[in-house]
From Swiss-Prot:
GO terms for molecular function: rRNA binding; structural constituent of ribosome. Pfam families: Ribosomal_L20 (PF00453). This is Large ribosomal subunit protein bL20. The gene is rplT. SUPFAM superfamilies: Ribosomal protein L20. GO terms for biological process: ribosomal large subunit assembly; translation. Belongs to the bacterial ribosomal protein bL20 family.
Length: 117
């Protein structure tokens, strides 16, 4: 029986990696070995940053809420504690959106929280 070297499968694998590396600079988009390393590293970065994105947005929301709350005379922690005590269930994403795009409504929310504290 003759030996099969697997050229078809190898060609397909190389094409798949080079397709993923399309747009990379220099040898990273032309040379399979270098492109393979670049693609593997980019997938590691993508995996890591999908998780980091969640942390980054939470930090951004907290910063925005804190800034808006301080403009209305409360710290972030007192504001969040007052929200919890008053039974207002708004998540940080919605609060940050309100703080940026609807400052009047956010100010009314702060007044409700001040009444509870």
């Amino acid at each position: 029986m003759s030996r099969v070297k697997g050229g078809v499968r190898t060609r397909a694998r190389h094409k798949k990696i080079l397709k993923l590396a399309k747009g990379y600079f220099g040898a990273k988009s032309k040379n399979f070995r270098i492109a393979n390393q670049a693609v593997m590293k980019s997938l590691v970065y993508a995996y890591r940053d999908r998780r980091a994105r969640k942390r980054d947005f939470r930090k951004l929301w907290i910063t925005r809420i804190n800034a808006a709350a301080r403009m209305n005379g409360l710290s972030y922690s007192k504001f969040m504690n007052g929200l919890k005590k008053s039974g207002i269930a708004l998540n940080r994403k919605m609060l940050a959106e309100m703080a940026v795009n609807d400052a009047e409504a956010f100010a009314q929310l702060v007044e409700k929280v001040k009444a509870v504290i």
